[in-house]
């Protein structure tokens, strides 16, 4: 399944784990949409690239529906961890468990680059996210609903080339949401956006997460973004989880509040002290 998807659209959010295939249902159009996220359990996870050991025994449990942000300096292993969870890279050692009855479409990834098909209109780009259900009778209706959820219903017939950067990322989000994933992983999805567009997208991500209840995993360099969105913030340092911060601030959260600023300062202090030790 994973190979076929990559052939038709390389490196998109259409991620699936090879172990999902035995559980795939034959009747696709009648799949019951799950309303809640999947729990995630990781034990002893290791990954190396050549002689470089990037992940060094990660142990982690994420309850169903939780929003987790992962931060750390460049090269610490945070994006590698996300790719292993999504099934985009092979595990060297350890296990990743995602509960029972997991389907390929239950996990989606949104990247920093929207990676839209330039020869397809906006609605068709969103339909790509349906994967094997793209030929179903309700494909157009599902794609239109996803576009409405991200505020771009009026752009359905536009070409990607005429969209702004923020609008392109909204289309990419709609493409990820159209299959109603139970785990949605974000790899620096807002990194290339201007400050105001980024805040708007943060609020959109939080809203769709609260509405749909999927488990969210966000990799970001922006600590303020992490504390604004997440229930937990994990600090990765030299391939291990060095810090696990619970964010108890009430939602919707007030950006720049004393509470969030304090959490941000604590995490930044830890990251800076790690630099001082190296």
Curated annotation (Swiss-Prot):
<comment type="similarity">
    <text>Belongs to the ABC transporter superfamily. Aliphatic sulfonates importer (TC 3.A.1.17.2) family.</text>
</comment>
<feature type="binding site">
    <location>
        <begin position="72"/>
        <end position="79"/>
    </location>
    <ligand>
        <name>ATP</name>
    </ligand>
</feature>
<keyword id="KW-0813">Transport</keyword>
<dbReference type="InterPro" id="IPR027417">
    <property type="entry name" value="P-loop_NTPase"/>
</dbReference>
<keyword id="KW-1278">Translocase</keyword>
<protein>
    <recommendedName>
        <fullName>Aliphatic sulfonates import ATP-binding protein SsuB</fullName>
        <ecNumber>7.6.2.14</ecNumber>
    </recommendedName>
</protein>
<dbReference type="InterPro" id="IPR003439">
    <property type="entry name" value="ABC_transporter-like_ATP-bd"/>
</dbReference>
<dbReference type="InterPro" id="IPR050166">
    <property type="entry name" value="ABC_transporter_ATP-bind"/>
</dbReference>
<comment type="subunit">
    <text>The complex is composed of two ATP-binding proteins (SsuB), two transmembrane proteins (SsuC) and a solute-binding protein (SsuA).</text>
</comment>
<dbReference type="GO" id="GO:0016887">
    <property type="term" value="F:ATP hydrolysis activity"/>
</dbReference>
<dbReference type="InterPro" id="IPR003593">
    <property type="entry name" value="AAA+_ATPase"/>
</dbReference>
<comment type="function">
    <text>Part of the ABC transporter complex SsuABC involved in aliphatic sulfonates import. Responsible for energy coupling to the transport system.</text>
</comment>
<keyword id="KW-1003">Cell membrane</keyword>
<dbReference type="InterPro" id="IPR017871">
    <property type="entry name" value="ABC_transporter-like_CS"/>
</dbReference>
<keyword id="KW-0997">Cell inner membrane</keyword>
<keyword id="KW-0472">Membrane</keyword>
<dbReference type="GO" id="GO:0005886">
    <property type="term" value="C:plasma membrane"/>
</dbReference>
<keyword id="KW-0547">Nucleotide-binding</keyword>
<keyword id="KW-0067">ATP-binding</keyword>
<feature type="domain" description="ABC transporter">
    <location>
        <begin position="40"/>
        <end position="263"/>
    </location>
</feature>
<dbReference type="GO" id="GO:0005524">
    <property type="term" value="F:ATP binding"/>
</dbReference>
<dbReference type="Pfam" id="PF00005">
    <property type="entry name" value="ABC_tran"/>
</dbReference>
């Amino acid at each position: 399944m994973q190979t076929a998807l990559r052939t038709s659209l390389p490196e998109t959010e259409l991620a699936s784990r090879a172990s999902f295939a035995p559980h795939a249902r034959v009747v696709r159009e009648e799949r019951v949409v799950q309303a809640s996220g999947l729990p995630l359990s990781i034990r002893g996870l290791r990954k190396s690239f050549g002689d470089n050991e990037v992940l060094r025994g990660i142990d982690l449990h994420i309850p169903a529906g939780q929003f987790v942000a992962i931060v750390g300096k460049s090269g610490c292993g945070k994006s590698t961890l996300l790719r292993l969870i999504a099934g985009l890279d092979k595990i060297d050692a350890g296990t990743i468990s995602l509960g029972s009855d997991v389907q390929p479409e239950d996990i989606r990834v949104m990247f920093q680059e929207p990676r839209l098909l330039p020869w397809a209109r906006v609605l068709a780009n969103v339909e790509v996210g349906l994967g094997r259900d793209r030929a179903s009778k309700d494909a157009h209706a599902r794609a239109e609903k996803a576009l409405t959820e991200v505020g771009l219903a009026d752009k359905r017939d536009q070409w990607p080339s005429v969209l702004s950067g923020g609008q392109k990322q909204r289309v990419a989000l709609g493409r990820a949401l159209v299959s109603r994933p139970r785990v949605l992983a974000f790899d620096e999805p807002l990194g290339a956006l201007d400050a105001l567009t980024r805040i708007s997208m943060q609020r959109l991500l939080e809203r769709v997460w609260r509405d749909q209840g999927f488990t969210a995993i966000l990799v970001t360099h922006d600590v303020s973004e992490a504390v604004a969105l997440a229930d937990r913030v994990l600090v990765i340092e030299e391939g291990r989880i060095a810090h696990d911060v619970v964010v108890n601030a009430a939602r919707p959260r007030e950006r720049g509040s004393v509470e969030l600023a304090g959490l941000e300062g604590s995490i930044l202090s830890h990251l800076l002290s790690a630099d001082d030790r190296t």
